[in-house]
A protein has these predicted regions:
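Start-transfer (signal-anchor) and selected internal transmembrane alpha helices
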Residues: 1-49, 256-258, 538-540
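Hydrophobic, aromatic-rich transmembrane alpha-helices
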Residues: 2-10, 427, 431-436, 452-479
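Short hydrophobic/aromatic helix or loop-helix immediately within or flanking a transmembrane segment
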Residues: 64-110
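Transmembrane-helix signature of polytopic, membrane-embedded enzymes
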Residues: 113, 130-153
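Transmembrane-helix motifs of polytopic, lipid-linked glycan transferases
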Residues: 117-138, 464-467
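Membrane-interface alpha helices of multi-pass inner-membrane proteins
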Residues: 158-159, 194-225, 230, 261
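Short acidic/glycine- and proline-prone juxtamembrane loop motifs at membrane-interface regions
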Residues: 162-169
């Protein structure tokens, strides 16, 4: 071991180089890596090395990215043929389709490789956020640099970096939000009013930018992020109170902090009004937009057999069906299982759906009824309502994904505050340690088996890295910023366990949250080792 640590000239050289790089150069380094590895996946790895996993256009066979690619091309053609007034940020409620179609239409290239630079910008920014956040705890720049690398280079991140997935927006947006919060914390300790105002203004800008990115991809997570902002405000309030008792903050600084907090809360909770504005361009509650293209032979056949109105325009446009009954009948034929149609009509409740589809299995409604939320008598109404929404999302997920290979805890109900709390230990276990070793070789398909092996290697690294968390807890237990990072990790790791009980979804949703713990753990181990080296030199 001594020989290993005494022969690290290359590592020492790299550390010196990192310490001399500013954030812009580090971001460029992260960006270059992201672009190169994504293009390698799309242009070389999939078509040449793993052709059995390749469906074309540099995309994996199977996944939401196929749908986003298809409709991105359709909407891009609509824009090119009819003008940019036909572009919407969230066509049919899918923000990622709006982004993809805009890029495709602007460049006139309908291949996913043109998206790589845009996705890489966000991924590199997310990694840089972790670097700055960990450095704010007082670790060296080189330590922070190496601690953020797992987020940048873990193979699972290639899924949303090289394919078309919403996670590239939400994961990096959440880290941008966290960076804004950390900067806000640091602004409190600034002596200059001007410096404080500048820092807090940047923090507010970052938080609002993150909310907008979340709005583009997953609008339902805006409210979730607003709840975490409340947690941030609570921790910040405690820090302000300690500064007041210590007489370590001026009245002007305190007043501006309160004003900034109120502004963030107001904007965060009113950004939903933007969502409502863009929803006007989405599917009307009484209309269903069904795209009919030449390749959709099955759908075209159904339309012809039922003598329904339709319009075929080369993969470019579609026809609006104005009656819910007709839409449901079509969906029944397109999907072999009637319950699949429910995925496209979330505004309906179970009983109204049953009226339109009489042959829908009754047992599913009985199960849904038994899982309905039971109001709590001891919690504030606002908290109870938010918990009920998570329970509804969980039920909705089970309704359509119960057959998925990695869905878990189907028989566990969390339909009351008591059950919600009792489930917490299990949620922590799954949120931070799943998939478990027993699940690493549970898949039979080649594609899933490859992904399981990749995730298994990542989990081994994560398990080892977690050993440093106890050290981190001891070193930074008195820092408010540290507890903000812990709150962030807990919040965004546990929420998907409650709302999306599927390992595949969990691995993606929790990625930023679990990488914060990994970064803290690695930073703590490095910090401890550096302290030991310094003490040995002092002793000599």
């Amino acid at each position: 071991m001594k020989w290993f640590f005494s022969n690290f000239k290359i590592i020492t050289f790299l550390i010196k180089q990192v310490n001399n790089l500013n954030n812009c150069y580090i971001w460029l380094l992260f960006f270059a890596y992201s672009v190169l590895v994504s293009l390698f996946i799309q242009l070389i790895a999939l078509p040449l090395i793993f052709p059995n996993l390749h469906i074309g256009n540099g995309l994996l066979d199977g996944g939401d990215w196929i749908v986003y690619q298809k409709y991105g091309v359709i909407m891009a053609n609509v824009i090119i043929d009819n003008g940019w007034e036909n572009w919407y940020l969230r066509p049919e409620g899918f923000g990622i389709v709006g982004v993809v179609s805009a890029i495709y239409a602007f460049f006139g290239i309908f291949e996913p490789y043109i998206l790589v630079p845009f996705f890489s910008v966000l991924h590199a920014l997310g990694a840089l956020c972790i670097l700055i956040i960990t450095q704010s705890l007082g670790v060296s720049r080189s330590t922070a640099f190496f601690s953020c690398l797992p987020y940048l280079i873990f193979p699972s991140s290639l899924l949303w970096l090289s394919q078309i997935l919403k996670d590239v927006f939400t994961l990096n947006a959440s880290l941008i939000m966290l960076l804004g919060m950390v900067l806000f914390f640091g602004a409190i300790d600034k002596k200059s009013i001007k410096s404080q105002i500048i820092s807090q203004s940047i923090a507010i800008f970052l938080i609002l930018t993150s909310l907008f990115l979340i709005f583009i991809s997953r609008p339902y997570m805006i409210e979730l992020s607003s709840i975490f902002i409340l947690i941030f405000e609570f921790i910040l309030g405690i820090k302000l109170l300690t500064r007041i008792f210590q007489s370590n903050i001026s009245l002007i600084n305190f007043a501006f902090c309160i004003f900034a907090q109120i502004l963030i809360l107001f904007l965060a909770f009113n950004i939903n009004s933007i969502e409502k504005h863009f929803a006007a361009y989405s599917i009307n509650q009484n209309e269903y937009h069904v795209y009919i293209s030449k390749s959709d032979k099955e759908i075209k056949k159904i339309f012809l057999e039922r003598n329904l109105p339709m319009q075929i325009i080369e993969e470019k446009a579609g026809k609006i069906i104005n009656k819910k009954e007709l839409a449901l009948e079509i969906l029944k034929d397109i999907y072999k299982k009637p319950k699949s149609a429910l995925r496209l009509i979330p505004s309906f409740n179970a009983e109204s759906i049953k009226n339109y589809i009489p042959d829908l299995p009754t047992i599913e409604f009985e199960t849904y009824e038994s899982r309905k939320w039971q109001n709590s008598a001891f919690l504030p109404r606002v908290v109870d309502v938010q918990m009920s929404k998570v329970n509804d999302q969980r039920n909705y997920f089970y309704l359509h994904q119960y057959h998925a290979n990695t869905t878990f805890d189907y028989d566990v109900e969390i339909n009351s505050a008591i059950k919600f709390i009792r489930y917490l230990p299990r949620a922590v276990q799954v949120g931070y340690f799943a998939p478990f070793p027993t699940d690493w070789n549970s898949s039979k398909s080649n594609k899933a088996n490859l992904m399981h092996k990749v995730i298994a290697l990542e989990m081994i690294f994560i398990y080892l890295a977690f050993s440093g968390f106890i050290i981190a807890l001891f070193i930074w237990r008195k820092k408010f910023e540290f507890w903000l990072l812990i709150a962030f990790s807990l919040f965004y790791s546990l929420f998907p366990v409650y709302a999306f009980p599927n390992i595949g979804a969990l691995v993606r949703y929790r990625y930023a949250a679990i990488m914060i713990i990994v970064a803290l753990s690695l930073s703590a181990i490095s910090y401890l080792y550096s302290s030991k080296i310094k003490s040995n030199h002092s002793y000599e």
